[in-house]
Swiss-Prot record:
UniProt keyword annotations, A-Z: Amino-acid biosynthesis, Branched-chain amino acid biosynthesis, Cytoplasm, Leucine biosynthesis, Magnesium, Manganese, Metal-binding, NAD, Oxidoreductase
PROSITE patterns: IDH_IMDH
Gene name of the record: leuB
Protein's UniProt name: 3-isopropylmalate dehydrogenase
Species whose genome carries this gene: Rhizobium johnstonii (strain DSM 114642 / LMG 32736 / 3841) (Rhizobium leguminosarum bv. viciae)
Residues given in the record as Mg(2+) binding sites: D226, D250, D254
Residues involved in substrate binding: R97, R107, R135, D226
Statement: the UniProt record of this protein carries the keyword Flavoprotein: no
PANTHER family per the UniProt record, alphabetical: 3-ISOPROPYLMALATE DEHYDROGENASE
Subunit details: Homodimer.
Free-text function comment from the UniProt entry: Catalyzes the oxidation of 3-carboxy-2-hydroxy-4-methylpentanoate (3-isopropylmalate) to 3-carboxy-4-methyl-2-oxopentanoate. The product decarboxylates to 4-methyl-2 oxopentanoate.
Length: 370
């Protein structure tokens, strides 16, 4: 069978500990399922700066470009707060996104039933919540030009950012949203501000045209982004897939994440365009949480977000849908049994460390996949 090439970038802080639990799952899948994963590993972030003077080396960048998928841990920490801006730890992630041309950011907001009480909303509003927010990652106001602060010469300054979207950028992110919806509940809600922004008018038009041309089997709804934020808090389970631009996606995905009550448990994926010959997309998978340097090396970090990111990798990079389903179910089963790391501890639960949580999830995964 064809090898499945994974490039692991554990990074800083708790990244290596969390990645260690994914390695166990990869080893089991290779042994028991003949999965054919071939792994290589590199440095990114502060540890890469310490070793190479850059947030990611050129050699590791080439390995990332050659891999079928990249698994990324976390970067940063106080140790590197004073390094030059262009080689700060976060620059490694930005370089990966840029060079891999990752334009679609997928952020699931999943509320495991066992953790519904941890949400700031009533449990009945969020229990069983499963939203996928798809954010355009390489266009919009974060990248548009001009972007500057100018001196007006009268004691005043003017800050300028430019919101820019071209048709092709909207078409391709809409295509990802419709394709993902087909594998879920077949519903997409597109969010923009067409009432006050010309880019929002174009966004609405292009999403509508793309839907009509290729995806008319998917249910499409349009919503103003501010109303969408309100509805996410009012009645979140009305949504399946939400697609939006870079700025609104940045905000709405964090709002949706907090509905779950467990920001540190959520995965994400960033996808590129399909290859013209193979149809495969470049992809990077990472937990939403940061490097948590205060608990690094203590063996208490929660590995669930990293494991759930690997489940997304199985689903979107390798089309191993059953295996992805089983791994996500294994996480839910472990939580149902009252097994918790300290960050999600609850009355009556049993507190465990990183390795024990990883072992418990692997044991459930073995049972489900037997």
């Amino acid at each position: 069978m064809t090898a499945r090439n994974l490039f692991l970038l554990p990074g800083d802080g708790i990244g290596p500990e969390a990645m260690g639990e994914v390695r166990k799952i990869i080893a089991y899948m290779n042994e028991a399922m003949n999965a054919g994963f071939v792994t290589d590993e590199g440095l990114v972030g502060g540890c890469a700066y310490d070793a190479h003077g850059a947030a990611i080396s050129e050699a590791d960048m080439q390995k990332a470009l050659a891999a079928d998928a990249v698994l990324f841990g976390a970067v940063g920490g106080p140790k590197w707060d004073s390094v030059p801006y262009e080689v700060r730890p976060e620059a490694g992630l930005l370089r990966l996104r840029k060079d891999l041309q990752l334009f679609a950011n997928l952020r699931p907001a999943i509320c495991y039933p066992a953790l519904a009480a941890a949400s700031s909303l009533k449990p009945e509003l969020v229990e069983g919540l499963d939203i996928l927010i798809i954010r355009e990652l390489t266009g919009g106001v974060y990248f548009g030009e001009p972007k500057e602060i100018i001196d007006l010469g009268n004691g005043q300054k003017r800050g300028i950012d430019t919101q820019v979207y071209d048709t092709y950028e909207i078409e391709r992110i809409a295509g990802v949203a419709f394709e993902m919806a087909r594998t879920r509940q077949n519903r997409v809600c597109s969010m923009e501000k067409r009432n006050v922004m010309k880019s929002g008018v174009l966004w609405n038009q292009v999403v509508t045209e793309t839907h009509k041309a290729k995806y008319s089997d998917v249910q499409l709804e349009h919503m103003l982004a501010d109303a969408g934020g309100m509805q996410l808090v009012r009645q979140p389970k009305q949504f399946d897939v939400i697609v939006t631009d870079n700025l609104f996606g940045d905000m709405l995905s964090d709002v949706a994440a907090m509905l779950t009550g467990s920001l540190g448990m959520l995965p994400s994926a960033s996808l590129g365009a399909p290859d013209g010959k193979t149809g495969k997309r470049k992809a990077l998978y990472e937990p939403v949480h940061g490097s948590a340097p205060d608990i690094a090396g203590k063996g208490i970090a929660n590995p669930i977000a990293m494991i759930a990111s690997f489940a997304m990798c199985l689903r979107y990079s390798f089309n191993l849908v059953k295996e992805a389903d089983d791994l996500e179910k294994a996480i839910a089963n472990v939580l149902d049994k009252g097994i918790r790391t300290g960050d999600i501890m609850a009355d009556g639960a049993r507190q465990v460390g990183t390795v024990e949580m990883g072992d418990a999830i692997l044991a459930e995964f073995k049972t489900l996949s037997a």
